[in-house]
Amino acid sequence: MVVVIRKGTAWKYSSLTDLVRVEPRFHLSLAPERLGLYPKVTMDLAAEKHDLIDPYGRVVRDLRISVTDRCNFRCQYCMPAEGMTWLPRNELLTFEEIERYARVCVEHFGIDGIRLTGGEPLVRAHLPKLVERLALLGVNVALTTNGATLRLHAQSLADAGLSRINISLDSLQRDRFLELTRRDELDRVLDGIDAAIEAGLAPVKINAVMMRGVNDDEILDFARFGRERNVFVRFIEFMPLEAGDVWNDKVVVPADEIIETLRAEFDLEPIVRGSEPA
């Protein structure tokens, strides 16, 4: 994999390290229309095919679907330790509804890849059944998970047709992992990574959010971890989720700084990368 920093340019020290700067993407909101076959937004377009174009002029080919807002972690940069109000379960889209919306996007908007996210998608019961339904649309189906219950699901996900998997992991140190996620689950996540490899969900990708003064001293540890486990590591710049938060170097470890840290230890090779999601 590659280390991506900005438009068209990337660096790598091996085939297993990836650095991502998150850019705004085009979002298509499809409100539930439980009485109709398709979302209202597509009713007048069902007979035609339309490309989705983002603000940078790129054709969007990937659809992200959040299957739940619930999570079994309480990561500090994501949600409070307690007091969360979840969507009522009867307000979540059913698997049938998700499949219908996905079919519209595939058949009429040129989508060829679907990523399932959350919350934590694996807390949604019977998720492999949804993966199977989406895979039958002829698209690549990917999953982003915290990995805590992946040992239980990896093989069934692979059998259902899952193409790719990303596992969020922000520290390789047990005490720090506990502090960041408020859950003592590092061993289960590492075991989940092994389970994904054993199930053939290759290449397995690790998403590591770098935060100054929190885990930026683990950059090289993650790079070595990727090489030793034969998994891709994607270093991701921290982006606050709250609209009022300010992007600043007191929290953020800029991509250039991560690259220099890697460069001090490894030889980096410039390569060119397209605009597709990592």
Predicted regions and their residues:
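A C-terminal junction/extension of Radical SAM enzymes
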Residues: 219, 225-228, 232-278
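Short hydrophobic targeting helices and cationic amphipathic motifs
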Residues: 14, 19, 27-28
